A protein has these predicted regions:
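Cys/His-rich short segments
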Residues: 1-12
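Acidic-glycine-rich active-site phosphate/pyrophosphate-binding loop
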Residues: 12-39, 88
């Protein structure tokens, strides 16, 4: 308050019975910006980390001279889709299973993700008539992390998922195959049975694609699945095969080009059509 009274600027959250409002304050002026639960990236206001991100972005934009209308439009149209936020809270519906794909790979990230999951599942339970919603998580961490960090990741995941499936990255970063997964699973088991800990089962499926298939085979309509990924495009491609619908980013791989288009298929189609544009698809030497 003193900062603003002296002519300073601030972005604050005004909590009301109708929801939380992001407000920009400049001196004695207070300018309402947006309801947090109406911003797509906040998942109905349950993703508090994206509420914080929205406030930071709004503050930076306002300080740079952007108008309130432009800031509102930016916040209201930004989503966590692959196109705008690849690998960060990408949401996919797979036969009515709510799948969230994210790069989370450490305990602090899992803690924040888990806190979101608690709020999101509670909101979803109030909107659903499907009965109990199970939460299944596929988790992993990089091999070059401290062993204590690997165990901690599993311990945190145990708090928030009914079933935890532990996988490993393609690059082991100096570890023996299975070593990292064993430590993460050890962390999960260390918490199972404690009051307030959800996890009742932990499994190890080392290969990422196999782990995705295993998790999805266990899920029922209405469940929430969180896939913490290493090879994002491969996972999206697998989900695409399950849904038989194109999924964003499933053809990204390591090549430059449109993330939704298969470059090999495009080349074959162009050649079959005798299209001179096929030359444009050929890699330069």
């Amino acid at each position: 308050d003193d900062h603003c009274r002296r002519g300073g600027r601030a972005v604050v959250l005004d909590r009301t019975d109708r929801g939380d409002m992001i407000v920009i304050r400049h001196g004695r002026r207070s300018m309402q910006l947006a309801w947090t639960h109406l911003l797509p990236a906040t998942f109905g206001g349950t993703a508090l980390f994206n509420v914080a991100n929205a406030m930071a972005a709004a503050g930076a934009a306002f300080a740079s001279g952007a108008g309130l209308h432009e800031i509102r439009q930016g916040l209201r149209t930004f989503t966590t889709s692959y196109y705008l936020s690849p690998g960060r809270m990408n949401q996919v519906n797979v036969h009515n299973v709510d799948v969230i794909v994210d790069y989370c790979h450490n305990a602090p990230g899992m803690r924040v993700l888990g806190e979101f999951l608690e709020r999101y599942a509670s909101m979803k339970s109030g909107q659903s008539d499907l009965g109990k919603i199970s939460r299944i998580g596929m988790v992993a961490t990089a091999g070059d992390r401290r062993e204590a960090d690997m165990i901690e990741l599993g311990a945190v995941a145990a708090e928030h998922f009914d079933v935890v499936v532990v996988r490993e990255d393609e690059r082991l970063r100096g570890r023996e195959r299975g070593f990292t997964a064993d430590l993460v699973a050890q962390g999960v088991r260390s918490r199972m049975g404690e009051p307030g800990v959800r996890c009742r089962q932990v499994e190890i499926v080392l290969d990422e694609t196999d782990a995705v298939r295993h998790v999805m085979a266990r899920a029922n309509p209405g469940d929430i699945v969180v896939l913490t990924v290493d090879q994002h495009a491969a996972v999206m491609s697998e989900l695409e095969a399950m849904t038989k619908q194109a999924q964003p980013g499933s053809h990204t791989k390591d090549s430059v080009g449109d993330p939704d288009m298969d470059p090999e298929a495009m080349m074959e189609q162009a050649k079959e059509a005798g299209d001179s544009a096929a030359r444009d698809l050929e890699p330069s030497s």
